[in-house]
From Swiss-Prot:
This is Cytidylate kinase. Pfam families: Cytidylate_kin. GO terms for cellular component: cytoplasm. It catalyses: CMP + ATP = CDP + ADP; dCMP + ATP = dCDP + ADP. It is found in: Cytoplasm. The gene is cmk. It comes from Caulobacter sp. (strain K31).
Amino acid sequence: MAFIIAVDGPAASGKGTVASRLAKLYDYPMLDTGLLYRAVGVRLLDADGDPDDPVAAEVSARELDISELERPEVRTRAAGEAASRVAVHPGVRAALFDLQRDFALREPGCVIDGRDIGTVIAPEAPAKLYVSASPEVRADRRWKQLLGQGESVTLDEVLADIRKRDERDGGRASAPMTQAPDAVLLDTSEMTIEQAFDAARRIVETARARWGNPKG
């Protein structure tokens, strides 16, 4: 059985950084599932499609090539907004499920980050983290990231985006963003990157010890 590390949480919570650091530590492959939805959104935007159209979004998801995750466009603010809109469609989530599930079953283990990994994609994951932070802190992080990418946007605009995405991600009927009952909450609001990673490492090490000795 693969040792799956599921890292869930809202946008700009620090989950991607935590996940990538954990993957490097354990030498596990990593999948950022948010990029899948961003890539689907970018496909639609490139074709002048509507991310709110469930049929067009599902077609885009089924035609997605994994290489498209490497496009710089998937890291933009527009891609993030489109991703949140296409992710509400059950057909899109179904189209991408097998790809994510197959990745989760890789031996000896893997790291997957997203919104529904511990609840839908890999509910059996031995290590589950729910990484979060206040909307204001997350908005400040994302704003600085976008400025570094050359995008022109205000902090207030980014905060509005964050709040809108939280509402959409948490309120969708299909696989809403929520903390799994057995996930450990990691609030990074007042943590540095190193502090967040160290806390995450301890959580995973505890899970690994329990996984290796289930009766312990």
